[in-house]
C-alpha cells in the first residue's frame, strides 16, 4: 500500500485555508475531467464560504508577513535565492490581484443559470431534468464548451485561491518529516514555537489512521484501527512534521 498524509490545523485561519485549498483541488479536477453535474458542488461550496467570510484582509496580512520574512531570508547565505525570489514575485502579484475592490465570486450572483442551480442543489435528488431543465440542456453541450464555462466561473476565485496555495506551500515548507513512534497507538508532542499545522505520514498497510488534536504549543495523536474503529494498542511507526 502507499503512504497517506493527514493534516490537522491548529488555528482557525489555517483551517479555513485548508478548506479552500481542498475545494480548489476539486475545481481543478472537475476542470480536467467531465464529472457532469457533480462539478457544481465544490463551486457552490466555495461561493457559500466566500459569502460567509471575506478572507481578503486575513490573506493580505499573511502575504505582507511572509514577504517580510522572505526579504530577511534573502539576505542570508546558503539559501535557495531563486526559490525565495519566486515566492516574493508570486506573492507580490497575488497581493495586487487581491486588492481589487469587489469580493471574489460576487459577480456569480448575477448569473441566473448558476443562481437557479444553487437553489436546488441542496435538495436530495433535485438534479432531475424536470427540476432543472436548464441543467439538462447545459450538460448536453460539448465537453469543450462546458469546460470553457467552468473555467470562466472558477476564475472569479483565482485572486483568493492563488495566494492561499502559496501561503500553504510556505507553511508546509517550515518543517520536514521526521521519524516518530506512537507507543500503544499514542503520541504526544509540544513546541516552544507556536505551531499552525501538524502533518502525519503513515503507511496505509498499518490499517489505521490518526486523529490529531491540540493547540499551537501542544498536540496529541491517537491512531485508530480502521476495521475495528477503536484505538490501536500497537506501536505505530510514522513520519511527523510540525509546521510553524
From Swiss-Prot:
SUPFAM superfamilies: YacF-like (SSF160950). One of its GO terms (cellular component) is cell division site. It comes from the Bacteria. GO terms for biological process: division septum assembly; FtsZ-dependent cytokinesis. InterPro entries: ZapD, ZapD_C, ZapD_sf. It is found in: Cytoplasm. Belongs to the ZapD family. Cell division factor that enhances FtsZ-ring assembly. Directly interacts with FtsZ and promotes bundling of FtsZ protofilaments, with a reduction in FtsZ GTPase activity. This is Cell division protein ZapD. It comes from Shewanella sp. (strain MR-4).
Amino acid at each position: 500500500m502507499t503512504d497517506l498524509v493527514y493534516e490537522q490545523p491548529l488555528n482557525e485561519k489555517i483551517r479555513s485555508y485548508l478548506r479552500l485549498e481542498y475545494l480548489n483541488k476539486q475545481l481543478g479536477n472537475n476542470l480536467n475531467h467531465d464529472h457532469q453535474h457533480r462539478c457544481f458542488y465544490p463551486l457552490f461550496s466555495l461561493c457559500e464560504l466566500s459569502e460567509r467570510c471575506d478572507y481578503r484582509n486575513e490573506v493580505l496580512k499573511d502575504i505582507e508577513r511572509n514577504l517580510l520574512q522572505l526579504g530577511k531570508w534573502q539576505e542570508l547565505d546558503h539559501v535557495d535565492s531563486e526559490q525565495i525570489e519566486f515566492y516574493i514575485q508570486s506573492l507580490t502579484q497575488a497581493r495586487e490581484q487581491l486588492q481589487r475592490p469587489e469580493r471574489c465570486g460576487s459577480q456569480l450572483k448575477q448569473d441566473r443559470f448558476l443562481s437557479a442551480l444553487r437553489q436546488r442543489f441542496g435538495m436530495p435528488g433535485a438534479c432531475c431534468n424536470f427540476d432543472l431543465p436548464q441543467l439538462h440542456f447545459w450538460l448536453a453541450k460539448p465537453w469543450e464548451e462546458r469546460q470553457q464555462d467552468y473555467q470562466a466561473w472558477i476564475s472569479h476565485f483565482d485572486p483568493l485561491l492563488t495566494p492561499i496555495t502559496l501561503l500553504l506551500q510556505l507553511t508546509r515548507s517550515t518543517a520536514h518529516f521526521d521519524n516518530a513512534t506512537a507507543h500503544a497507538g499514542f503520541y504526544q508532542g509540544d513546541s516552544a514555537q507556536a505551531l499552525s499545522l501538524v502533518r502525519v505520514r503513515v503507511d496505509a498497510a498499518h490499517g489505521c489512521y490518526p486523529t490529531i488534536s491540540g493547540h499551537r504549543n501542544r498536540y496529541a495523536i491517537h491512531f485508530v484501527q480502521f476495521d475495528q474503529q477503536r484505538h490501536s494498542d500497537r506501536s505505530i511507526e510514522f513520519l511527523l512534521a510540525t509546521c510553524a
